Amino acid sequence: CWNEDNETGFSGIAPNAGLIVVKLRKAKELFRKKYYCIDPKYEAYAETDIMLAVHYIDHIAEQLQRPIVIFLGIGTNLASHLGTGPLDQYLSGRAMLRGVAVVTSAGNEGQARHHYSGQVSQNDEKVEVKVGESEYGFAMELWGLAPNRYYVDIESPSGQKTGRIQGGLSGQRYVTFLLEKTRLIVEYFTVDTSAGAPVIVMRFQNPAPGI
């Protein structure tokens, strides 16, 4: 948008704009491997580091006394998506200021199908998750509506069932499958502190391929 070519008569919409490029620090290995089960070949960043990067851009813009457009070309499949998290609130606050615009990525998943929304009208609802070959691992969250309580019952591709995994008010449950190397960690939160809603976090390590 800042290019200007006098020979061809071309000009972007903001020819006098400059760029502030911030390189984010990678998330700690403990969170990448143990909590979010992220394949090492993919990039991942901590929410706190993203907030620090935005703060740095704010600081530079304030020194230069110039308006800014903050663009975040990153996203996540986790969290409540209600706009109540720390990063959500921080960006919303910045966007309310004069001379500050915040642009983020949204949607464009195509056939990835990383999200599902349903309604438990009776006793249960069946949801299928397709796992590819040689998958390193993944984390998945089930968000509900307060004051309801939710439980999960997981069936592996080989047909093994965990039965209803009792969560109680909170706590972790560890599940192993006899015929597969999959290790499952299920964690219940009666009320998430940022969203005020119940959430079940499921972390799959070395998941078996299939549905």
Question: What name fits each language-model region?
Answer:
Residues 1-46, 65-66, 99, 136-138, ...:
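Subtilisin-like serine protease catalytic core
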Residues 22-24, 52-82, 105-106:
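Short acidic, glycine-rich surface-loop motifs adjacent to enzyme active sites
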Residues 31, 38-60, 82:
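A conserved hydrophobic secondary-structure block that centers on an alpha-helix together
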Residues 2-3, 55-62, 92, 96:
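Sec-exported extracytoplasmic/periplasmic mature domains
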Residues 63, 75-211:
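Substrate-binding/specificity loop regions of serine endopeptidase catalytic domains
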Residues 2-5, 48-55, 197-203:
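A Trp-anchored, charged/polar loop motif used as the substrate-binding/catalytic surface
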